[in-house]
Design a protein with these regions (language model features):
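Extended, folded cores of ATP/NTP-driven motor/assembly subunits in large transport
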Residues: 1-445
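The Walker A/P-loop phosphate-binding site
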Residues: 2-20, 259-268, 274-278, 287, ...
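Switch/coupling segment of Walker-type NTPase motor domains
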Residues: 33, 68-98, 109-112, 516-615
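P-loop NTPase motor domains
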Residues: 43-58, 433-488, 537, 570-764, ...
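A generic structural motif
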Residues: 67, 172-182, 325-330, 419-431, ...
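P-loop NTPase motor core of the ASCE superfamily
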Residues: 110-111, 577-623, 782-905
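Phosphate-binding P-loop/Walker A region and its immediate neighborhood
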Residues: 198-214, 220-221, 231, 240-244, ...
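Conserved P-loop NTPase motor cores
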Residues: 352-353, 487, 493-512, 517-522, ...
């Protein structure tokens, strides 16, 4: 039967009673979120830590344990967070999204992909006890009840005081007995597996099942405090068996004793092992073995400043080892009194005089005295210093002894480079391990590791910290790479505008994943049965190709009127009701005709566009309006007709102006969509729908002199304005979230209609209607003052220094040479064997700013291999619109470049 280490006598709610008579109050805390790229958040986190230390210093205790335990997040919790942002979640209603999430859940449960971890901060506070040392020693050999004479009322009062002292910023919760079991499992399997947390229940809830946990039913484990010696002895036995030369002349007795004669210190190890015999197999007779190495910090950097220290945060980095940490803390004002500092200096002088044998050893003592004087100066300059001592312990685990040895050596070197002196006590591994466990006292070794500081200065270490980005609920869009915990970043699409501006802007060089990130969000918008509108001006129709696979998508060529259902019209008189139709017509044509809005021609145009005027004359389209103008005799009519005929004759105006009628009952092209019907479909919420406007035949004017624009440039500007007005009207008719996607937004520059309707207006008032913009650009400078209110921003890899600087500024990150190098050379780097493609496994790397926190991340892949194929824009693998048949489906595989496309189909 297994027993807890250290032995426990009783667990009651969040109280732990150890066999040595100590009583502990246990709490679970959440780390303070820190933005590594914004000093203000680090300062706030330091202030919170100083507040925590100040609160703990008021608790009458001499022993506090703060441990950071790593745990694996339950995939089901992540799934609940994803669906938690959907008010009417129903797997039937959202069948397509459900299939994507089912696949994601299977991949998460496999443990190979999308595995999330986090860190639980455990704080245990010892209640002061009056038991003498002799009583505690007796309790270890004689069965003495440690609870005899316990003042339960005093204990309850102490526990309340402890809980109420913890600052709310850390979201304190009372631990339960199940968490002690979990902590034991975590500590004994470090490096083997990372267990999920038990459910946290309220022990005072009457519905909570009541039980008294036994302290004799822990999993049985075996400790080997000299794991390296065991491994070395195994190698020695193998050499004996193989008849290695150095073993051939040994007698039978010497064969047994030779190893330990050669290496006399092997009984005390630097690495210990914890085996699980209850899980033994034929290949693992001792069961799975966790190799662990622990060290403390014997000396801290010889500086006192407020710089952010990563210190304990190293356990969350990509160190290629499983790791936890513990701080054993005590507080005393005696530590910062001048008398105490003076006595310490006298001791150093005496030790130096007695022990220094030469000038170099004497110099070491002089250095320590200089550090002491700097410390005294620092606390004198601090207002109301709170003295504290802390012993820092780090534990690293692996299932491979050799690997652990190499990693611990590298980590020790890393600590030394940062000014810390690690102490790896030979023979003291289990002592350190035990001090990391709930219910354990600080030992003599722990006392030796205590280092003196103040609450203010040690707050710079920020041991209780985290880097969490994204929304509490929503769709998965990225993996947090700020550390190695792998948090899945969520984006709340349906409720995005509740907290204000919801628009987002991405920037990244071609081939670095910008369009991929936008398509991922588009996929989720449509899978949520919401409406999306896209302007696709790519020459190969990359958005049309992708959208046709994920939603009931309508693709209309804004120049020719081509759709996969036949030619359609974007004529405002056909597509919009009154008065929207009149507004769009005037905004579209008056600038083209170079007619001022205050002229008689403009007034005449407004009169004939009136719905009542058109109704009695059968004017249902722009072509019929032109026919009526041909019969009118007013000079204004002749001028309007002249201009209409000019533009109607151009090949790129067909989508807005029907060809001449072939017969009296020829109504021309039907409207590309019935907007009223669309609104009703979206109200039903059952059919995702998207519109893609193909505008590749409509180039915008890039020059600064408006007179240099060609007719095609002028018509393109008018078309973009009409698309913006139609889209804005659609959004206004649909209840719920609508999203406008604009990739490579440089085409919008200078078009005030589009900028106002689809960028500035949603930023100001779109949140009231749930609408927002998702934009992308290769160069961040395209995001001018019109995008100033956008808070959510993404940045992916860049290829030039100029673009890298603009991208860093865009995402509110400091422009540092190290970050410039990272965004150019270390973000989705090219494959070393083929520089034209991104290195395997490095696609979509970049940063995400959720409006509050910025983190380095890797954007999610498209959650379907087939869909990912249609989203791929790599030149050699890209599916072009020309590869689709007349129904929008992929053509049969043909020889040559697209022969592999049959697999995508």
């Amino acid at each position: 039967v297994g027993e807890h280490v250290p032995p426990l006598r009783l667990r009651d709610r969040n109280l732990t009673f150890s066999a040595d008579g100590s009583v502990w109050c246990n709490y679970l805390l959440t780390g303070i979120n820190v933005n590594s790229y914004q000093p203000d958040t680090a300062t706030a986190a330091q202030d919170s830590h100083e507040l925590l230390y100040a609160a703990l210093s008021q608790i009458p205790t001499d022993d506090i344990m703060i441990t950071g335990f790593k745990y694996r997040k339950n995939p089901l919790d992540t799934m609940n967070a994803i669906t938690g942002g959907i008010p009417d979640w129903d797997p039937v209603r959202y069948r397509y999204l459900g299939s994507l999430l089912d696949d994601l859940y299977r991949r998460m449960c496999s443990g190979k992909e999308f595995v999330e971890f986090d860190r639980l901060y455990w704080i245990a506070i010892s209640q002061p006890t009056s038991r003498r040392m002799t009583e505690r020693l007796v309790s270890t050999v004689v069965d003495v009840d440690p609870l005899e004479g316990m003042d339960w009322a005093d204990l309850e009062e102490f526990e309340k005081h402890c809980f109420n002292s913890l600052p709310i910023e850390f979201r304190p919760r009372r631990a339960t007995p199940e968490f002690v079991d979990w902590a034991f499992e975590r500590a004994t399997t470090r490096g083997l597996s990372i267990p999920m947390l038990p459910p946290l229940v309220d022990p005072d809830d009457p519905n909570t099942p009541r039980f008294k946990p036994t302290e004799k039913a822990y999993p049985e484990v075996m400790f080997d405090e000299a794991a390296e010696a065991t491994a070395l002895y195994s190698t020695y036995l193998t050499d004996l068996e193989n008849g290695r030369k150095y073993t051939q002349n040994l007698s039978k007795v010497d064969r047994k004793r030779s190893l330990f004669k050669r290496f006399r210190t092997l009984a005390g190890g630097k690495i210990m092992s914890i085996s699980h015999p209850s899980k033994r197999t034929a290949s693992l007779p001792d069961g799975p073995v966790s190799y662990q190495s622990l060290f403390g910090i014997a000396r801290y950097p010889a500086r006192f400043d407020e710089a952010v220290s990563k210190f304990t945060y190293i356990v969350d980095q990509a160190i290629d080892a499983d790791a936890d940490f513990t701080l054993r803390v005590r507080f005393s004002q005696d530590l910062v009194e001048t008398r105490s500092v003076s006595n310490t200096e006298k001791d150093l002088v005496s030790e130096g005089t007695a022990n220094a044998s030469d000038e170099f050893e004497a110099h070491e003592y002089d250095t320590k005295r200089a550090e002491l004087r700097r410390f005294h100066t620092a606390i004198r300059d601090e207002s109301g210093p709170i003295g504290m001592q802390m012993a820092a312990i780090f534990a690293f685990g692996s299932d491979d002894l050799d690997h652990l040895q190499s990693r611990v050596s590298a980590l020790q070197m890393k600590f030394r480079k940062n000014g810390y002196t690690p102490l790896l006590p030979v023979g003291g591994q289990k002592d350190l391990w035990t001090m990391m466990m709930p219910g354990s006292r600080r030992t003599k070794l722990g006392d030796d590791l205590l280092q003196t500081s103040t609450a203010h200065w040690f707050s710079g270490a920020m041991p209780l910290r985290r880097s969490f980005a994204g929304d509490p609920v929503g769709m998965p869009i990225a993996i947090n790479k700020e550390n190695a915990l792998g948090q899945i970043i969520l984006l709340d699409i349906l409720n995005a505008t509740n907290q204000g501006n919801a628009s987002m802007a991405f920037t990244g060089a071609q081939g670095r994943g910008k369009s991929h990130a936008l398509k991922l969000i588009f996929l989720f918008v449509t899978a949520l049965n919401r409406y999306a509108s896209v302007v696709d001006h790519s020459p190969h129709g990359e958005w049309a190709v992708f959208a046709l696979q994920v939603a009931r998508t309508q693709v209309v060529n804004a120049a020719t009127g081509f759709t996969y259902a036949g030619y359609r019209s974007m004529d405002p008189l056909k597509c919009l009701p009154s008065p929207e139709a009149e507004i769009v017509m005037q905004a579209h044509y008056l600038p083209l005709f170079e007619i001022d809005s205050k002229t008689s021609e403009a007034a005449y145009f407004a009169k004939i566009l009136n719905a009542d005027f058109r109704k009695v004359r059968g004017i249902t389209s722009t072509r019929r309006l032109m026919e009526w103008l041909a019969t009118a005799g007013e000079p204004e009519a002749r001028l309007l007709l002249f201009n209409f005929e000019h533009w109607a004759a151009l090949p790129y105006s067909r989508a807005f102006i029907d060809p001449p009628r072939r017969s009296h009952d020829d109504d021309g092209y039907p409207p590309f969509d019935n907007i009223a019907e669309l609104a009703q479909r979206m109200e039903d919420g059952t059919t995702p729908h998207a519109t893609v406007f193909r505008t590749n035949g409509l180039p915008v004017y890039r020059g600064k002199n408006p007179k240099g624009a060609t007719d095609q440039n002028k018509w393109a500007a008018a078309v973009y304005g009409s698309i913006a007005r139609m889209t804005a009207f659609r959004f206004s008719q649909i209840r719920g979230t609508c999203v406008f996607f604009a990739d490579e937004i440089s085409f919008l520059k200078g078009n005030e209609d589009v900028v106002e309707l689809l960028i500035r207006s949603p930023d100001r008032i779109g949140r009231k209607d749930g609408n927002f913009l998702a934009a992308g650009s290769q160069h961040a400078d395209d995001y001018d003052e019109n995008y100033a209110m956008i808070e959510k921003k993404g940045a992916l890899g860049q290829k030039t220094r100029e673009n890298a600087i603009a991208a860093l500024s865009h995402i509110d990150m400091p422009v540092l040479d190290s970050l410039i190098d990272m965004i150019i050379n270390q973000t989705s780097p090219p494959d070393p064997d083929n520089p034209k493609i991104v290195r395997a496994g490095r696609h979509g790397e970049g940063w995400w700013n959720d409006g509050t926190i910025t983190v380095r991340c890797q954007y999610f892949p498209i959650l379907s291999a087939v869909l990912a194929r249609f989203a791929d824009t790599t030149t050699s693998r890209m599916i072009r619109e020309s590869d689709l048949d007349e129904h929008g489906s992929l053509r049969s595989a043909a020889a040559g470049r697209h022969a592999a496309n049959a697999e995508a189909a």
